[in-house]
Amino acid sequence: MAKEILFSDNARNRLYSGVEKLADAVKVTMGPRGRNVLLQKSFGAPTITKDGVSVAREIELKDTLENMGAQLVKEVASKTNDEAGDGTTTATVLAHSIFKEGLRNVTAGANPISLKRGMDKACEAILAELKKSSKVVANKTEIEQVATISANSDSAIGKMIAEAMDKVGKDGVITVEEAKGISDELDVVEGMQFDRGYLSPYFVTNPEKMIAEFNNPFILLYDKKISSLKEMLPILESVNQSGRPLVIIAEDVDGEALATLVVNRLRGSLHIAAVKAPGFGDRRKAMLEDIAVLTGGTVISEEMGMKLETAEFSCLGTASKIVIDKDNTTIVDGNGDNERVVARVNQIKAEISNTTSDYDREKLQERLAKLSGGVAVIKVGAATETEMKEKKDRVDDALSATRAAVEEGIVIGGGAALIKASKKVNLDLTGDERIGADIVLRAISAPLKQIAINAGFDAGVVANEVEKSSNENLGFNAATGEYVDMFEAGIVDPAKVERVAMQNAVSVASLLLTTEATVSDIKEDKPAMPSMPDMGGMGMPGMM
């Protein structure tokens, strides 16, 4: 395929055209008075969203070169979303503003490489000031404020997320699902729950609820299949003498072993239940070890030189309660040693920070939550499927923003934090590096200006009012049109979101400015299909 090669200003201007188109579509969603964007899907009904990254992901431009520019800024939105969970619109607006200011200077003859150096230095200085001004999230109210702002000022969502985080802790897993009705619900599972139920319904102790419930049980953990009961007899006799129930968690229990356990359970001679171990392969071994740490037991494993028939009574774990239904097992208040639990939690945290796989990270975070607190499920309800998808997107955003706030603290919201931080920056630079730093310092007000525009106010007047104020916490409340103390008004942003958005925006804008040539495909128009030849003379002859 033939290629189109463009150089210097011609290349950068075409790239800028694509960046501008993407930014124009994304920035209308910004702020409490931002508008919705309607997205056509390849199948199903159109989606209505106010989520910047959802808009960016749908954009593909016809012009190849413009599309290259748009895709680079789309990457900014996606990366910001992956890293901080929110701030995609801020990152897009900043990248567009920095590229626009920089392009003007490059066209006027400034050296792009020197500009980039100055921009990087300004970015570092602003982020250092931002870090100084951040405030630790101290209570449930502040968590609620962050979640509410990120959910487009929906206080009901903010309250629900704060409630969920309060119950399962900052390391707990909070998942978002679609509800069956129109109202929102919050379900909290305390203790460790895994998705394996009883191996036989004959283990049920409460026929009305179809659950097996045991108080103060012993827990046997085995990493192999149990097919014969002979190897288990010593342990079973010891448990039977104690008069306490036993829950077996093994790779599988089948054949003679399962049949014998069921018969003894029905006779009432044993209070027992058997459950398959969660996970597969190495993950199963790790999860069995997690359960062992939580319950104070030991996984009986031949790899460790242990056999079921010689296992000691001390290998059994204990918990205050276990509830098993046909799909799930919940262990409440395991009696494990706190120091061992903390060490295990720290080990999993280290694995999370070292892994490069998103799937592994998700599974590790689930394990971490089960050890450290519990699992909360937010069920989002709405009248229509379109509304439910839009609402679910907002809840996901709010949840990610809240986690980011707990991690690195909060700063004043509404785009004011970056302006206040930039005012304190004093860099000793000269020439084009100075110009590069000034580009970033000027462009930093773009998010605040866009919030003001979307709310119907004069962007220049609002930005000037916030910038000249000596009150460190003063910002613009676009919902009411007032200048307020942002912390007091509860208008806050996670410091991590602002940091990641800023870093990614400067990174991609400086790369675009230092682009001197582009090579892209030339789309060739395919010739139209020729029309079918005339079929004259092929008809049936008339009847005589």
UniProtKB/Swiss-Prot annotation:
Any one GO molecular-function label of the UniProt entry: unfolded protein binding
Gene Ontology biological process terms, A to Z: protein refolding
Major place of residence: cytoplasm
Annotated residues for binding of ATP: 29-32, 50, 86-90, 414, 477-479, 493
CDD domains: GroEL
Gene3D superfamilies attached to this UniProt entry: GroEL (3.50.7.10), GroEL-like equatorial domain (1.10.560.10), TCP-1-like chaperonin intermediate domain (3.30.260.10)
Location relative to the cell: Cytoplasm
Domain of life, per lineage: Bacteria
Pfam families for the chain: Cpn60_TCP1
SUPFAM superfamilies per UniProt: GroEL apical domain-like (SSF52029), GroEL equatorial domain-like (SSF48592), GroEL-intermediate domain like (SSF54849)
An annotated GO cellular component: cytoplasm
Catalytic EC class: isomerase
EC number annotated for this UniProt entry: 5.6.1.7
Region Disordered, annotated ranges: 525-544
Alphabetically ordered keywords of this record: ATP-binding, Chaperone, Cytoplasm, Isomerase, Nucleotide-binding
Reaction(s) catalysed (UniProt annotation): ATP + H2O + a folded polypeptide = ADP + phosphate + an unfolded polypeptide
Disulfide-linked positions: none
Function of the protein: Together with its co-chaperonin GroES, plays an essential role in assisting protein folding. The GroEL-GroES system forms a nano-cage that allows encapsulation of the non-native substrate proteins and provides a physical environment optimized to promote and accelerate protein folding.
HAMAP family for this protein: CH60
Family to which the UniProt record says this protein belongs: Belongs to the chaperonin (HSP60) family.
Quaternary structure annotation from Swiss-Prot or TrEMBL: Forms a cylinder of 14 subunits composed of two heptameric rings stacked back-to-back. Interacts with the co-chaperonin GroES.
Classification via NCBIfam families: GroEL, PRK00013.1, PRK12849.1, PRK12850.1, PRK12851.1
Protein name: Chaperonin GroEL
